[in-house]
């Protein structure tokens, strides 16, 4: 496994190869290396080895890797590395795969959280509606991930949803970060140019939080 015993030298060499190929900036070399990693990924069964290869694809992969990486999004052991690799690839196809996987609600809460975090990291606006539909989870950690993602990808269309969640949380700091997510979304909406909506939300938040004794 990567990092253990005799394989550590192999890991070091492969990491060096990845960085060398990326530094050269030659597309043919990058594509050939990515395809070699994809073939290796299909042949190995060890979780750590697969995760190591996926991390290399995170560094040099492009659209040729999306289909294969998508197949690991429902695997609890590899959903994290796969989701992070797709978010790093950042192509339209990679983004669509992340959103489509979340829409299917397959996998487990753990794999869904990994996908949601990747969506938040790359700020995929197309995920807004599916994330809104996931609000209200009894799993506090899931709710936290959904709220954080909406604060990163949302628009004025999500203001009322996050306002309601923040109000329910009493406008105070708690495990799901509802109030912080709402404030972050207001800032995002302001940056998007929807000034009136952002100002209205901010004023409403100030009024209600003051009434609740939180300011």
Predicted feature locations:
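Start-of-helix signal in alpha-solenoid helical-repeat scaffolds, especially tetratricopeptide repeats
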Residues: 11, 176-179, 199
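Structural signature of alpha-helical solenoid repeat scaffolds
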Residues: 14-22, 58, 74, 87, ...
